[in-house]
């Protein structure tokens, strides 16, 4: 997930999803539920459903303007490390990413990487995946896996997320993972990526488990972990 993509530089802004050697020549793309083989060259697509290359699928649940290239590229190791050779090398390269345009304001993107898939049929089936994106803003990003009952949340500042199944409030930026089993218990894991060495208060309400709001004070002041 990505959100809050901003720029005033007046030049095109992009997010690269992957760039790798074209180890497999076959690149398949699905757009408007029609699959096609991608030819050699540079291409732009408006909201394709998915792309498949070398056993790895890329699913785009929120659409977007994407660029894809499949071509021979030339360069030298010297361009990034002056102790290396200046000899030019050529390789076939696969590149995939999002175009945000010039001067984007609060642009977002979302994609799911699906390894171990080798056919268009399986990619079409994966579009019915249990992964739900419930929030993708510059203040919070929330994803849920419905089959596993796992919620993953990133709060970039104090905030509250709520829907019909749970409510979560935090008083500081943090990353959370919640597993809401149906046994009457929920597992909460929290991280402080900012390493602020402070206390973070989490308020959690899961009506299916309890009608009472649970408050947990997570103390990172000494160990940095909880």
Report residues per predicted region:
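Terminal accessory/anchoring regions of large secretory-pathway or extracellular enzymes
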Residues: 1-226
